[in-house]
């Protein structure tokens, strides 16, 4: 074969390739119905989104959302509204009244319903073209790989370090990109992990898990709905950008978005380091493999630690009814102290009139000095009878142990289940927040 023949064949192949591309493009165009053109037209005409090609990418995409709460709630409608073809929702929690100020995908009529099913109902009404899969299970090493396998992108809308490490580890092993965020109070953070399987992953950023006693939840620290809602919406934006091809291997740089809502709204973007060669999950010699995760060799509970609240003996605890019958909310007087160790802003919302409020952190900072404690509670001494309560009966156990072991007060009991258990079992007229 002469060089001229070879060049002719190359030109012929080029033409055939161009014709094939046109045919495939035509087939792709036919995959959008007239109704879909109308539905998505306003986003297809935005420059940089890829037009019809970008919309078809959305239609073919499969996104798994882990958590239908504060972050998942605002993310999901925008993903479904934009036309992401398949959405999976992992959440075994049920809708509670306390969720509704921020998890606006749910409503009062859905209280007691599984969050994933509640969300599915709303999303199917929003866009019937989207396939919604629900997984009413707790995500764990035993099921994460099978659930993740069918999806292109995983959105981490969870609220615990343990689950964040698990999601990132599994995603790296499966080559999945993760859009991860967190929110608490008036602040939030957002990042993209393992982009196109080139990193970095969550362990690259945080090789050591935070102290479990330093990690708060929205149940403990509170949350302003629009603040976490904004972070969830930004998660949806980043996910759409990944699907539409706005990011690629050449222009993507690891980042962390940090949002603060109060007192003045601010949004800052920080450049983050890339994949770490010594990372145990995505580094040069990974040890956190699929086999290690599924077999339990990687113990996330041990790695992340957990708060051990079970520090009181059975005789040191009172049920809510025992407290009411033997002590009661009016318990006070000489050598009698009803101590509430909730944060002061919790105490201000609702409390027993005779209770003295010293938050657990302030009690801990006293370092067992009885004279410092007496400056706050003049009638307390080592022979006093003390009953301790908190919101749920966890911090009160730690405080009971502290009062006995560090302050030397011998007669101390805590109320199991705390202030809220008393409301549930004894007096439901007290405000429960």
Curated annotation (Swiss-Prot):
Organism this protein belongs to: Candida glabrata (strain ATCC 2001 / BCRC 20586 / JCM 3761 / NBRC 0622 / NRRL Y-65 / CBS 138)
Name of this protein: Adenylyltransferase and sulfurtransferase UBA4
Listed EC numbers: 2.7.7.-, 2.8.1.-
Gene label: UBA4
Residues at the active site: 218 (glycyl thioester intermediate), 390 (cysteine persulfide intermediate)
Record's keyword terms, sorted: ATP-binding, Cytoplasm, Metal-binding, Multifunctional enzyme, Nucleotide-binding, Nucleotidyltransferase, Transferase, tRNA processing, Ubl conjugation pathway, Zinc
Function: Plays a central role in 2-thiolation of mcm(5)S(2)U at tRNA wobble positions of cytosolic tRNA(Lys), tRNA(Glu) and tRNA(Gln). Acts by mediating the C-terminal thiocarboxylation of sulfur carrier URM1. Its N-terminus first activates URM1 as acyl-adenylate (-COAMP), then the persulfide sulfur on the catalytic cysteine is transferred to URM1 to form thiocarboxylation (-COSH) of its C-terminus. The reaction probably involves hydrogen sulfide that is generated from the persulfide intermediate and that acts as a nucleophile towards URM1. Subsequently, a transient disulfide bond is formed.
Cofactor(s) it depends on: Zn(2+)
Cofactor note: Binds 1 zinc ion per subunit.
Residues the record lists as binding ATP: 70, 91, 98-102, 115, 159-160
Pathway the protein contributes to: tRNA modification; 5-methoxycarbonylmethyl-2-thiouridine-tRNA biosynthesis
InterPro entries (UniProt xref): MOCS3/Uba4, Rhodanese-like_dom, Rhodanese-like_dom_sf, ThiF/MoeB/HesA, ThiF_NAD_FAD-bd, Ubiquitin-activating_enz
Broadest EC class assigned to this enzyme: transferase
HAMAP family xrefs: MOCS3_Uba4
One term of GO molecular function: URM1 activating enzyme activity
Assigned protein family: In the N-terminal section; belongs to the HesA/MoeB/ThiF family. UBA4 subfamily.
Cellular component per GO, a single term: cytosol
Residue positions binding Zn(2+): 201, 204, 279, 282
Main location: cytoplasm
